[in-house]
Amino acid sequence: MDEIKSKLFYEPKNGYDLIDAAEHVAVEDYCRGYMDFLNTSRTEREAVANAIAMAKENGFVEFRPGMELRPGTKVYYCNRGKALILAVIGKHSLSGGAVIAGAHVDAPRVDLKQNPMYETDELCYFRTHYYGGIKKYQWVTIPLELHGVAVLKDGTVVDICIGREPDEPRFVITDLLPHLAQEQVKKTMAEGITGEGLQLLIGSVPYAGEGKDRVKLAVLSTLNDMYGITEEDFLSAELAAVPAFDVCEIGFDRSLIGGY
């Protein structure tokens, strides 16, 4: 019986038992590059831009309709800055088959609404809606970065990235203090933090003078100085809040990767 079991049964093995020392070193080297990619690719646009740069370094050229294609030619096609196709031209017709590998570059996140900015209780916020199947309670009281693009009235596309560098400000979705949350903690995990409650805190200092929405005005003034943005430009912007944590190694043996 043992003989036929060993022949027919599948016995899972630890992957580290299946590689030698040289392969282990290669795995570590690859993962360090992967961590660098994750740190600089927080959105689809950033992932695609970084992938294009890597492709160019490896001999890929942008595909143009009508261009000459020969076996071995490496081409890429970027779809609206958010999707990427890479191809290596083969020797035979597609009728003979092709090897296709696919992957997604989007991830759960908190997006800004089209008219997101408002002031209440002398604090300024961005209204948001979440993308993907997030656990909403994981997104409160953690530092967040703002990534994306805005299209100004003159058609200029402005890249925005705030909070990635150590000396830049970050943002937060607030939560109740423990001693004020007696009713909240009785709710289920899905109900404790609502989608409507995921509002991004972005400022608290008022613009000098008198009148309404002075904190909102101060924040808008700062954004206008930095990027030339007015409130109307948010209608044609695509901005997302993502965790402001660097990717890191997990465990005493550094064998796992943790990060967004």
Task: Name the predicted role of every residue range.
Residues 1-260:
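N-terminal hydrophobic/helix-forming segments and targeting peptides
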